[in-house]
Amino acid sequence: GALVAAYGLYDGFLTL
């Protein structure tokens, strides 16, 4: 999710 992206976690999203 875009929310967890702020935490720098991976949620089926390309989040570093």
Swiss-Prot record:
Gene Ontology MF terms in the entry: antiporter activity
Signal peptide segment: none
Keywords: Amino-acid transport, Antiport, Cell inner membrane, Cell membrane, Membrane, Transmembrane, Transport
Domain of life (superkingdom): Bacteria
Subcellular location: Cell inner membrane
Cysteines engaged in disulfide bonds, as pairs: none
UniProt KW Cell inner membrane keyword: yes
Gene Ontology biological process terms in this record: amino acid transport
Catalytic activity: L-ornithine(in) + L-arginine(out) = L-ornithine(out) + L-arginine(in)
Membrane topology designation: Multi-pass membrane protein
Entry annotated with the keyword Membrane: yes
GO CC aspect terms: plasma membrane
Residues annotated as transmembrane: none
Protein role: Catalyzes electroneutral exchange between arginine and ornithine to allow high-efficiency energy conversion in the arginine deiminase pathway.
Family stated for the protein in its record: Belongs to the amino acid-polyamine-organocation (APC) superfamily. Basic amino acid/polyamine antiporter (APA) (TC 2.A.3.2) family.
UniProt name for this protein: Arginine/ornithine antiporter
Origin species: Pseudomonas putida
Gene: arcD
